[in-house]
Amino acid sequence: MSKDKFLLHEEFKNPLNKAEFLEAKKLYLEFITKNEYEIKATKDIFQLIQNIKRSPEKIGPYQIMSVFEALNRIGSDLVLLSGAEKLFTSEIPPEKILLRMGNTQGFDFEVFYKGDKVIYGEAFNAAESFCKHKMRQAIDKLVDKNPDEKATSAIIFINEEMKGILEKYKNKKEKQSQMVIHTIYCKTN
């Protein structure tokens, strides 16, 4: 995400330890709670589409992008923040985590453990109608494009509303792979 569109680029550009993460998360959430953007009321559906999907705005930590795009990124970012916090408070917390906020390419996050062990992960915040498709994409990417050919595990962060739908979901690629994919369901509010 370019720094001209994501206002917290500097805070998230490097792997963060727990203290750095908590500070960056606090700052991110301040951008959300102090947001001044308001959806412009209109009964004209064509104008509403223009306002939401086309007009560049500043919303939360994003600027110069449509409200639609910014809200999609914020939704995924909230999953990333919640998932990272769960990892930092887990039984085996990582040393650092690199979060790619508003990511559009590469892996969404990397988890760094002692001994140079890196676990790659994907994150998404999806609606019920799209969650299995997003899960399939995430699994395929983690299995097929993992830069560590010897990787035995990966992580997927998902908005917790999809737990009932995805709890028992396994796709063909995951079943055939030697990789264990850990799913972490995340609060987004």
Regions found by a protein language model. Give the residues of each.
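Conserved catalytic cores of phosphodiester-cleaving nucleases, focusing on short active-site segments
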Residues: 109-129
